[in-house]
């Protein structure tokens, strides 16, 4: 099956696993998915990230992170730029999610970075998603 929006698929799988409090979620791997998952790991939204090969398909195993009483660390994931409607921002228009409490993932000429890194680098780009 051909996937029209692999980023939305990644976010939906993580969102669904988060709602039912699964420990691990597995998704097909790609460079952009790895970059988004690495941002989630460095920002503290997931516990661990592992890449493995399942037959002929590269997969990502994402270990979800929860609080002491299984409360969710990720409260929201939202896809912003979609295949049917791309959303871009200039370097001075980089969005803030919940006044800096969340993270906007931006695809720039310097790679896929957070909104804070994009402001620090002085670059704009395509706003992929919000995580809070």
Curated annotation (Swiss-Prot):
The keyword Ion transport does not apply. GO terms for molecular function: rRNA binding; structural constituent of ribosome. It comes from the Bacteria. One of its GO terms (cellular component) is ribonucleoprotein complex. Keywords: Ribonucleoprotein, Ribosomal protein, RNA-binding, rRNA-binding. One of the primary rRNA binding proteins, it binds directly to 16S rRNA central domain where it helps coordinate assembly of the platform of the 30S subunit. PANTHER family: 40S RIBOSOMAL PROTEIN S15A. This is Small ribosomal subunit protein uS8. The lineage of its organism: Bacteria, Bacillati, Bacillota, Clostridia, Eubacteriales.
